[in-house]
Amino acid sequence: MPDTTSLDSIISGIETNKVLIENKIIHTLTDCRGYLKNDSLTIYIGPSNKRMKGIVGDCGGIYSWCIGNKDIILMIDPQIQGWIGLLPFSIAHQYQHAYSWTKMNLGALLAMNLMDRIVAEGKADWYAHVLYPDVKMPWDTALSDEGLQYQWSRIKAEMRSEDYYQIQGIMFGSDNYPEFTGYSVGFDLVQSALKKNAALTPEQWSNESPALILEMSEYKTQ
């Protein structure tokens, strides 16, 4: 029998917080449009389900993704404490993806190599942190400085890999890599590049190629 009791509770929690969620979305989009212009976005809200319970929990109660330059999906579990504080960050992260969707060819997920994915996620996280610097996401502290260096030494030779399952294992964690390795490395890589090039606007660096961002960073492949 499917677990409908838990799902009903999640849906009820979303309905209870409907106005709060709507207001958060409105304010966040206003913040986002102050740096990058992207109008007429549609944001879909859905309940977390049993299959997604693990990743939603690991992400603090919200798992989000972008499915085009105008569509963002938010999967929410209001039963996880602190989710509302992460909502603006999650929206801003996906907003940057939506802005970059066509320019960076984000729609071709299966054709992206590891460098594309790491830099794309790093850019989105950096943008969200520009808007909400006090918000801490799980992957912000997933790796220590030493851990970042060590994992980079392991994956830097794989930057051109287009193996989808290998990339997913690096990004989210697997038997071979700690949880959120790719996200942690991506954010630190982009952060190191943009701190050294602070004059670049969000519009400018959003449109820079992954290869150039890597070249600008303190991360070296040799």
What positions do the PLM features span?
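Inter-helical turn/loop segments and adjacent helix faces that build the functional surface
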Residues: 82, 104-114, 133-140, 196-201
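Soluble non-cytosolic domains of exported or imported proteins
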Residues: 19-23, 85-86, 90, 114-118, ...
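Active-site recognition of the HExxH zinc-binding catalytic motif
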Residues: 89-103, 121, 125
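Post-HExxH zinc-binding segment in Zn-dependent metallohydrolases
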Residues: 111-151, 220-222
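Short pre-active-site segment immediately N-terminal to the catalytic Zn-binding motif
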Residues: 75-91
